[in-house]
Curated annotation (Swiss-Prot):
Its main location: secreted. GO terms for molecular function: ion channel inhibitor activity; potassium channel regulator activity; toxin activity. PROSITE patterns: SCORP_SHORT_TOXIN. GO terms for cellular component: extracellular region. It comes from Hottentotta tamulus sindicus (Scorpion). It comes from the Eukaryota. Potassium channel inhibitor. This is Potassium channel toxin alpha-KTx 3.8. Has the structural arrangement of an alpha-helix connected to antiparallel beta-sheets by disulfide bonds (CS-alpha/beta). It is found in: Secreted. Expressed by the venom gland.
Length: 38
């Protein structure tokens, strides 16, 4: 995944930030969102 500068506590929090970044499938890893490119 691609780390983005968004803090998180759970993967559901990353869905929208990843969409906003033009990506999908957000996951929370080490307190930060990681996204999968389209």
């Amino acid at each position: 995944g691609v780390p983005i500068n968004v803090k998180c506590r759970g993967s559901p929090q990353c869905i929208q930030p990843c969409r906003d970044a033009g990506m999908r499938f957000g996951k929370c890893m080490n307190g930060k969102c990681h996204c999968t490119p389209q």
